[in-house]
Each structure stands twice: as structure tokens, then as C-alpha cells.
Curated annotation (Swiss-Prot):
The lineage of its organism: Eukaryota, Viridiplantae, Streptophyta, Embryophyta, Tracheophyta. Transmembrane segments: none annotated. The keyword Transit peptide applies. GO terms for molecular function: GTP binding; GTPase activity; mRNA binding; protein domain specific binding. It comes from Arabidopsis thaliana. PROSITE patterns: G_TR_1, G_TR_2. It comes from the Eukaryota. This is Translation factor GUF1 homolog, chloroplastic. Promotes chloroplast protein synthesis. May act as a fidelity factor of the translation reaction, by catalyzing a one-codon backward translocation of tRNAs on improperly translocated ribosomes. It is an enzyme of class 3 (hydrolase). GO terms for biological process: positive regulation of translation; translation.
Length: 681
């Protein structure tokens, strides 16, 4: 293949096919198509691009015209533009629907990130995010895009998609005027997509439907469009078909952001009000706060005031995220950026708080601020007791970045010193545990997760209890309440029965079921949060072969018949194995735990009873038989009275040993039983 030696870049160049290449009539007809209609793959084949309904040419290996667009858009990103030319938007998507890939492509096409610096999941900084394919810590990026010769500033505020971080998502959406609703064209609407769309609608955002992965063989875009219209109620007549991986439809998305998402209100003359949507701890500069200016303006050197925490600081540095931090002189209404003010604790600059000027305070803070409330608790103990100080230091460092993480010291007779930790949900708990083990080289034992119970005492007091060992005695408590959640399950119709059976097993209360498509149903249940902190999600995926998805939200506390189940080994209570269960499940849980302990505890010289008790009542029991020592082996006959004397002496010794003997439960047994507790609860 030969190309013209001199190319005039002002007009699109053309390919000239050699004589050996024109044997095919179809190739001869294409011999004068411009280079912008082709993309050269690594295997050196040329592919014709469909530019009709599927969108623009791929931008993955940017063509000549695409490179010029990126250069024009990416240059001078820091130049000020009128407020009418600012667009703040977010991307809403279920896990694995292509949110991070689309964000990467937007950064690349607008020239925000150069090709040489580009990598997959560019905005996902943590290794854990890349491995799991999820967004944990949200990011923001400022892009410059030229539309009809007019420069626009596009602020992408990335969001975590998981339900554990729904509060952070709501604050991110509150900082935007619009959102891209990204749905996989081969999978359709999923549960967490619905949850975040409802949050966007509550914030009155302009939603642009985007159907991703249209290049997949199993893509059914028309069917998914109908699903979006029926389930969510959005008008999909202007939905955009795209493939973030192949770069199809990216320009259409950028144009739609400019055309359809409204500009921020021009309120630069009002007192400063800025919404914090994220923060993290920098060891050299203190807490770096990401915020959106709603009213007024802020510049370096201003004395700022955090309205929820009541703390004030001087702004040492103000800048924008593009996506790296770049200092600017000031930020005004509608803009998104960061501020460094030598804040020493993330707790002083919480997500959802309002920043204002110390000397000219705003009359009211921005609505929607909430304190992060842990919903799931578990104990973390180092396998090596010498690592306790390291665990404390690691938790303190993590807490600098994660204000939702709570912990307090805890002591166990079996596992030594550790911490009782509170988390937003199960994913949050898994992420913290994995980061402790990976980033701080700690080897940890995790107790069975529990939720926060509300205990009403006979004297009228109400206390919160997350640790079974702190549950008051039955005579002192009037009632116990547990948190309930509303859970929505989206599943193919073939697995409806399996999911309903699972929910009924977990004390679920059926509310409604509706078909959102010909072969997909939405099932609504209310069930205790405690029933979800075990293996509920694993069972959900297992029983539906991975096709079902779920979304849940806490709806409050309800009174339940809850009891404390204790495990006694040789009449001694083992506190770490105590748990709070519903009375109806006490026997099955107790039986499973005692049987597992019988398998794992080494046999002793005396008989060891293993009991599951409610108060003083034993509901399940197993016995570990004694190792028999043959004391008659040395007797080669003789009088029977001699043998009786030896046997009697042995029995007395075993009785004394049983009274004073101590049974040590090995570490492996603890870990296996704690894992079993997570499965059976």
C-alpha cells in the first residue's frame, strides 16, 4: 500500500490501493475513501467504520482529524470561560457497564490526557479499584471542549457505583446539573443503576441515556431502550449509541453534554457557598478538599469556614483537577476544584459540608448534609499479637482518608487485643480489610460481622449495641430492635422462584413483583440487615448463575425476637464466638457451630462438652471424647482388685483434670468457625 508523498492536512488525505490490492470489486470501489473513514489495527488490517446510527469514527487510535480535535480541545484548559459555557456532569452506571472506560475516552478525545500518559481506568488510582473493576474513591476532571468554535469547560465528577457509598454518590450528583446514564446494551438496566438514577432525579439532573457496548454480538439496543423507558420513565428518543472501548459515539456524547445539560446559575456575587463532594489526606499538605462552588467565589489566602464542623482555616492553595491538580488564582460559581488549607483531619471537612467565608458567612448551609453512620461492625485482631500497634497505626492512617470508618479497642480472652470496627456496608468492610492486609502487610482475623441493634431497657433507656458481649441480660432489657432494609432484586424470570426462596429463608417480607421486560422481573422485599451481612450476595449470584443484581436501602428499626447465643467449651464461655440471632434460627446456628468445633478442637485427656446456650439453657451440645490411656497395659494377670484400683485412680485423675484443665482452641478452629458464622447467620 502506497500513500501520497505529500499530504495536505487541510483536506482529508486518501489511500491509494496498489494493483495487487484491487482484485476485489469492493476494494476498487473504496480506493478513494478518505483516511478519516479508516482505522489501522495492530494486525495491519483496515476496517470500514459505520458512521450512521452508531456514531462517529473510533477514537481509540486517534485519527488525524481526531488528533486535531483533541489538540484544539485540550489546549488552554485553564483559560476562564463564561459561566454559561460551563457544564458539570456525572456518569451513572452499574458495575461493569463501562463507566470508567467511557471516562477514559472522554479524557482522551478532549486532549485532557495525552495518548502517551493514557492507561485503562485512568481515574481509578488504587490497585484494588483496578483489580475489582469498581470505583471506590471518586475523582473529578476538568476538560476543555470546542463546540462550534466556542470553548466549553466540562467538569466530570466521577462517582462510586456501589450502594455502600450512596451518600457520596448523592453529594456528587448534587454538585452537577446533568448525568450520563450508561447502560450495557447487552445486559440492560440493573439494580444499582436504578438506585443512582433515582438519586439523580431527586437532584433534578438532566439525564442523557447512553447505550454502551453496542459492538458486542449480543447487544440489543432497541430492547434496552424500551426497558429504560418502561422502568425509569426516561424519554429515550435522543439516546446515544456508543462503544467506549472502540471509541464509537464519543463526539456525540460530548455534543449532547454541551447541548442538553444546563449551565450553572450565575451567582458569583453572593456569599461563598461551596459543596464538598470528596476529600483525602495528603501527608505533606493536610486534607485536600474537592468541592463545587455553588455561590460566590474563593481565592488563595481566603479565610474559609466549614459550616458543619465549625472549623476555620486559611486557603493555602486553590486549583482545578485536570485530572491532576493545577493551581489557579480563584474559582467562581459553577466551577469545580480543590482547596488545600492545612486541615489535619478528614472529620473537619466531611463530604456534604458547606464551605463559606469566615468574614462573610452564608445565611444557610447547602441542604443534604449527613453524618456517615456505620451499619456493619466486626472485630479485627492481628494473628501475631506483636502487630497490634501496627494495626492501630494502619487504622488511624486509613481513617484520615475515610471519615466513615470507626474503630475502638477491644479485648478478647481468646484472640488478645484488637479493634471493633464500623463500616458503611459489606463492600466497605471488605475493602478496608483488604487494604490493611495489602498496604500494611498485616495478617488479620475477622470476627463475624454484626449490625447495630437498638436495645430498650426496662428502666426506659435506649442504647445501641453492636457487640454481642455488651448485650444486656434478658432481665434488664424490654425489647431489641434491628435495622431493616428494602431490597430490590432484578432477575431473569427463570430464577424468580430461587430468589423468593432465598429471601424467605432470610426472614424476608414480600412486598411486590413486576415485570420490567418480557423476561426480567423486579422483586421487592423487606428483610433484616443482619440477614444480608453473611453470604446473602454470594447465594444470590450462585442461585441465579450470576444474572441477578440487587440494591438495598435502610428503612429503619423494627422490634424482633432476638437472643444472644453463647458457646461454652468445657463449661467456659468463649466470647468471640457469641452472636446475636433470631430465636427461630438459634437451634440451627447452635447445632452447626458445635458440630464444627467438635471437628476442629484437638482431643484432650478428658471428655470435653461443647455447648450452645441461650442464657443458662443448653439448646445444642456435642461431646469431644477423651483420649484413652491404657493403664492396664502393664498388668499381665493378677488379681482383679489391682486392675480396679488402677482404673479408679485414672478416673479420679481425669475428674480432677476436667475440673482444672483448660481447653485451648487453636487459631485455625477460630478462623473456620468465624467463617461458618458468616455463612449461617
Amino acid at each position: 500500500m502506497a500513500m501520497a508523498s505529500a499530504m495536505d492536512l487541510s483536506s482529508p488525505p486518501t489511500f491509494f490501493l496498489s494493483g495487487t490490492s484491487t482484485s476485489s470489486p469492493s476494494l476498487r470501489r473504496l480506493s478513494s475513501i478518505s483516511v478519516s473513514g479508516f482505522r489501522r489495527h495492530s494486525n495491519r488490517k483496515l476496517q470500514i467504520l459505520c458512521q450512521a446510527t452508531a456514531g462517529t469514527e473510533p477514537q481509540s487510535g486517534l485519527s488525524v482529524s481526531g488528533s486535531k480535535l483533541a489538540a484544539r480541545s485540550g489546549q488552554d484548559r485553564l483559560l476562564k470561560v463564561p459561566i454559561s459555557n460551563i457544564r458539570n456532569f456525572s456518569i451513572i452506571a452499574h458495575i461493569d457497564h463501562g463507566k470508567s472506560t467511557l471516562a477514559d475516552k472522554l479524557l482522551q478525545v478532549t486532549g485532557t490526557v495525552q495518548n502517551r500518559d493514557m492507561k485503562e481506568q485512568f481515574l481509578d488510582n488504587m490497585d484494588l479499584e483496578r483489580e475489582r473493576g469498581i470505583t471506590i474513591k471518586l475523582q473529578a476532571a476538568r476538560m476543555r471542549y470546542v463546540y462550534e468554535d466556542t470553548p466549553f469547560c466540562l467538569n466530570l465528577i466521577d462517582t462510586p457505583g456501589h450502594v455502600d457509598f450512596s451518600y457520596e454518590v448523592s453529594r456528587s450528583l448534587a454538585a452537577c446539573e446533568g448525568a450520563l446514564l450508561v447502560v450495557d446494551a447487552s445486559q440492560g438496566v440493573e439494580a444499582q443503576t436504578l438506585a443512582n438514577v433515582y438519586l439523580a432525579l431527586e437532584n433534578n439532573l438532566e439525564i442523557i441515556p447512553v447505550l454502551n457496548k453496542i459492538d458486542l454480538p449480543g447487544a440489543e439496543p432497541e430492547k434496552v431502550l424500551r426497558e429504560i423507558e418502561e422502568v425509569i420513565g426516561l424519554d429515550c428518543s435522543k439516546a446515544i449509541f456508543c462503544s467506549a472501548k472502540e471509541g464509537i459515539g464519543i463526539t456525540e456524547i460530548l455534543d449532547a453534554i454541551v447541548q442538553r445539560i444546563p449551565a450553572p446559575l450565575d451567582t458569583a456575587g453572593k456569599p461563598l457557598r461551596a459543596l464538598i463532594f470528596d476529600s483525602y489526606y495528603d501527608p505533606y499538605r493536610g486534607v485536600i478538599v474537592y468541592f463545587r462552588v455553588i455561590d460566590g467565589k474563593v481565592k488563595k489566602g481566603d479565610r474559609i469556614f466549614f459550616m458543619a464542623s465549625g472549623k476555620d482555616y486559611f486557603a493555602d492553595e486553590v486549583g482545578v483537577l485536570s485530572p491532576n491538580q493545577i493551581q489557579v488564582d480563584e474559582l467562581y460559581a459553577g466551577e469545580v476544584g480543590y482547596i488545600a488549607a492545612s486541615v489535619r483531619s478528614v472529620a473537619d471537612a466531611r463530604v456534604g459540608d458547606t464551605i463559606t467565608h469566615y468574614s462573610r458567612k452564608a445565611e444557610s448551609s447547602l441542604p443534604g448534609y449527613e453524618e456517615a453512620t456505620p451499619m456493619v461492625f466486626c472485630g479485627l485482631f492481628p494473628v501475631d499479637a506483636d502487630q497490634f500497634p501496627d494495626l492501630r497505626d494502619a487504622l488511624e492512617k486509613l481513617q484520615l482518608n475515610d471519615a466513615a470508618l470507626k474503630f475502638e479497642p477491644e479485648t478478647s480472652s481468646a484472640m488478645g487485643f484488637g479493634f471493633r470496627c464500623g463500616f458503611l456496608g459489606l463492600l466497605h468492610m471488605e475493602i478496608v480489610q483488604e487494604r490493611l492486609e495489602r498496604e500494611y502487610n498485616l495478617n488479620l482475623i475477622t470476627t463475624a460481622p454484626s449490625v447495630v441493634y437498638r436495645v430498650n431497657s426496662v428502666n426506659g433507656d435506649t442504647t445501641l449495641c453492636s457487640n454481642p458481649s455488651r448485650l444486656p441480660d434478658p432481665g434488664q432489657r424490654k425489647s431489641v430492635e434491628e435495622p431493616y432494609v428494602k431490597i430490590e432484586l432484578l432477575t431473569p424470570k427463570d430464577y424468580i422462584g430461587a430468589l423468593m426462596e432465598l429471601a424467605q429463608e432470610r426472614r424476608g417480607e414480600f412486598k411486590e413483583m413486576k415485570y420490567i421486560a418480557e423476561n426480567r422481573a423486579s422483586i421487592l422485599y423487606e428483610l433484616p440487615l443482619a440477614e444480608m451481612v453473611g453470604d446473602f450476595f454470594d447465594q444470590l449470584k450462585s442461585r441465579t448463575k450470576g444474572y441477578a443484581s440487587m440494591e438495598y436501602s435502610v428503612i429503619g428499626y423494627r422490634e424482633s425476637d432476638l437472643i444472644k447465643l453463647d458457646i461454652l467449651i468445657n463449661a467456659e464461655m468463649v466470647e468471640p464466638l457469641s452472636t446475636i440471632v433470631h430465636r427461630d434460627k438459634a437451634y440451627s446456628v447452635g447445632r452447626a457451630l458445635t458440630q464444627k468445633l467438635k471437628e476442629l478442637i484437638p482431643r484432650q485427656m478428658f471428655k470435653v462438652p461443647i455447648q450452645a446456650c441461650i442464657g443458662s439453657k443448653v439448646i445444642a451440645s456435642e461431646a469431644l471424647s477423651a483420649i484413652r490411656k491404657d493403664v492396664l497395659a502393664k498388668c499381665y494377670g493378677g488379681d482383679i482388685s489391682r486392675k480396679k484400683k488402677l482404673l479408679k485412680k485414672q478416673a479420679a485423675g481425669k475428674k480432677r483434670m476436667k475440673a482444672i484443665g483448660r481447653v485451648d482452641v487453636p487459631q485455625e478452629a477460630f478462623m473456620a468457625v468465624l467463617k461458618l458464622e458468616r455463612e449461617v447467620l
